[in-house]
Amino acid sequence: MGHAARGKVGVLLLNLGTPDAPTASAVRRYLAEFLSDPRVVEIPKLLWMLILYGIVLRVRPAKSAALYQKVWTEAGSPLMDISLRQTAKLSDKLTADGHQVSVHLAMRYGNPSVASTLREMHKQGIDKLVVLPLYPQYAAPTTGSAFDAIAKELSQWRYLPSLHFINTYHDNPDFIAALVNSIRDDFDKHGKPQKLVLSYHGMPERNLHLGDPYYCFCMKTTRLVAEQLGLSKDEFAITFQSRFGKAKWLQPYTDATMAALPSQGVRDVAIVCPAFSADCLETLEEIVGENGHIFTHAGGEKFRYIPALNDNDDHIAMMANLVKPYL
């Protein structure tokens, strides 16, 4: 394609990824790619490869596949289904607002890959690229890894597009407002719980000490949401879920908190996951299934999950407002 034929603007939405199917073989392929990323597991490569291929990928795929089967729908992976709807709705929103832009979706691991999606955008003549990783709070293993994948592909291009990479939106007013509105809607429908738990994806505590701002960004998101909801310190809690391995991760842990709350007199809990832009295994199974059971088994009476922002109108409007300054 000639240079004169270029001049198109592209928006790339990027999320973590999902197996192609809820089977052990598909999950194994996905986990092998995910857990081979040095941004995700920061231990000496040779040692980790021995552990990964000698132990983890022998045991974990079948167990994870069974969990994926619980949340899989006729539309497939919940994360993929929601992400495709987000992409289509953002495209419609930007078009309605007068922007000529092509919106694409890529997954950091699995399909559609970052490389294949960028190549498709390149074929379309896109020479202005706006990347929005759908991780509200920057973290090196997520947002940082997304940038790595984009840079790896672009390093092979002769003609580079202008690039705008949105690295965090943890305190963006539209994001906070969308979260607050979703929580208020839940409170209006089901009543205000004794405690609102804001559960974020965890990470090794070591990452914090190495300078990763994720923990601080999670704290700020929580503070802004609690302030706008008018919650006292006793009415909300911040926790971290999905820990993996034996290292110390960010605390307090979500599962330990769910087990302890009933003994503290908290019998009615609502939980929201502000680090997840779309519902997925970690919310639909780990939170709704595992942690809901932990809470009720410990004596809790009412447990409910407030869905991720997914493709609701406030969320799509927020995405549009994030990318518009760069179009």
UniProtKB/Swiss-Prot annotation:
GO terms for cellular component: cytoplasm. Fe cation binds at H201, E282. Pathway: Porphyrin-containing compound metabolism; protoheme biosynthesis; protoheme from protoporphyrin-IX: step 1/1. It is found in: Cytoplasm. The keyword Lyase applies. Its EC number is 4.98.1.1. It is an enzyme of class 4 (lyase). Gene3D superfamilies: 3.40.50.1400. GO terms for molecular function: ferrochelatase activity; metal ion binding. InterPro entries: Ferrochelatase, Ferrochelatase_AS, Ferrochelatase_C, Ferrochelatase_N. Belongs to the ferrochelatase family. HAMAP family: Ferrochelatase (MF_00323). Catalyzes the ferrous insertion into protoporphyrin IX. This is Ferrochelatase 2. The gene is hemH2.
